[in-house]
Amino acid sequence: MELEKIIDSEGNIHKTIEVLGKGGQGIVYRCLDKDVAIKVVLRDRDFIKDKESLKQYEKSVLNLSFKPIERHFPMSIPLVTLKEKQGYVMKMAEGYEPLKTFLKKPSVLENEEKDGIFRINNAIQELCKDNHHMALSLSCYSQTQGLRSRLKILTHLAKLLFRLQSKGLVYGDLNLNNVFYKDNSAFLIDADNVRYESEKALCYFYA
């Protein structure tokens, strides 16, 4: 299968291999180069290509460098904007997975079971022998380290949001696609969602 190619404003070609997340604001792709990911902004489910919008967006992305974000703060900061599309290339921490993987639907787990990717715990299978979907969900919960791991990740996420808010910043689109995790630590993507508390925007979702 041919990989989709996306060109940045400096002429570098990036090959995408999978969609990490998709929502009303855009799509985030994992790239063949595991160190980077790409966000493409959408409007009405289509790419934004008019020159004025591209110019304004590039300016807003560049303005991120002037915000008081700590140098080693665990968030994917934009490296370069895209050519002829609203979006940017961002540094991606290796080994992190989106938080949505904690909440897989039984239908997804069922397909993974058929493909040999996922297996139901034997004890859970016996306990839920009359409810296969329940067995799938409980096995997934158990195999992703259960409640303790989830609480540690959410605690770390709360600390990250507090650190932003202590600088007068808010993260405006907190969802399962924008929060990544590894070893009970959280990592934020979509840094263009970071704004000053008093900054004007078309839409706000306060954390």
Mark where each language-model region is.
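A short, low-complexity linker immediately N-terminal to eukaryotic Hanks-type protein kinase catalytic domains
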Residues: 1-16
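ATP-binding glycine-rich loop module of kinase domains
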Residues: 16-18, 24-88, 95-144
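Short, well-ordered beta-to-alpha junction loops that form the rim of enzyme active sites
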Residues: 92-93, 176
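Conserved short alpha-helix within the protein kinase catalytic core
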Residues: 144-158, 162
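Catalytic-loop of the protein kinase fold
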Residues: 154, 161-182
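Catalytic activation segment of kinase domains across protein kinase-like and atypical kinase folds
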Residues: 172-207
